[in-house]
Amino acid sequence: MLHVKNKIAKHKNKLKNLSTRLFNSNSLVLSQTTAYDIIAEYKQTRIRYYASPNKQYKEPLVFVAPLAINMAIYDLYPYRSLVKHFQHSGFDVYLVQWGQYNYKDRFLNFMSFIDDAIPHCIEQIRKHSKSEEISLHGWSMAGIFVVLYCAFRQPNFVKNLIVLGSPVDSYASGRTGKLFQKVNQLIAKNKTLQNKIYSETVPKSFIHTSGLLNAIGFKIIDPKGWFHSQKRLLLNLDNTQKLYEHATMGNFLNKMIDYPGGINQDMIFNVWLQNPLKNGVIQLQDKNIELKNIQCSLLIGAGRSDQIVSAAAVKPLIELTNSQDVTFTLIPGGHLGLMSSQSSANEFWPLMTTWLKQRSSKI
């Protein structure tokens, strides 16, 4: 009889947890609890400052976020937070937080960030930190941003560059890469269409995507990952930590922000469809940007199971710069997991921290 009562109580608890997850998920969200200050603002951009309680290194670590996401991925859980990890490893941490872009911002493009917003933010960070140089971190699209910033802006004041999950040889990125390669081949058969698409004459209003569409698209690109996430929740409804983590990650994925039309033009029609970075050069407007201009220490990482940007798409960067200090590593997890999973925190975060400490100036 007691066994039956316990079983009923367990099922009731599971149903209660499922109900909370479905109808009151905001009460379960754990992200962005680490305190920070806003040290500067530029247009819609804010610079967050996470002071180290035991600063040991002169150069601060600067995270540049990808577009479309909120900042939760950098401070996901109180017990597994990237910014908190580096704070307590002796680094002052800065996070470049982009604005809540909407249709009015549809003309923003790569150059708006690599030749305007990022240089301005780095200047403010250098002043605030009283450090001539910084360490710069970019994941996903932000990895492309920081690579192109370092290649284009001289001097760039970057001592150490960390690039994670960013497509350099886009055609090598599994099924997604092959699809873009095939589409590009089809476009090339019609010169009128090719000129229309690649000459930036497509109205930005046509290719601007909303936050909702981006959230749906992210799930469609990796349906297997989304399905397994839901399955794990249903199998672990009696596990409070997994319930909180699922709600926190769901909140992050569901609250995406618009991609400006100009960004989609540069990312999809240029980086993904034409694949210029494979050859170490990209043309943006009237500028030719060459990756060989990068000379700082470089750490490149790729998710072992990344279904969006495969390791084969990331790795070619090791051959394209003039850096004399290049490290490549595989990271546990997929495109999100490489940033946030427990396996990444256990295996990759210590490696990344050691790499950075060895190349930073001890105070």
Label every PLM stretch briefly:
Residues T34-N102:
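Short, surface-exposed "cap/lid" segments of acyl-processing enzymes
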Residues L2-H3, K127, S131, V147-Y259:
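Alpha/beta-hydrolase-fold enzymes
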Residues L136-G138, L164, G301:
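Short beta-strand immediately N-terminal to the catalytic nucleophile in serine-hydrolase-like folds
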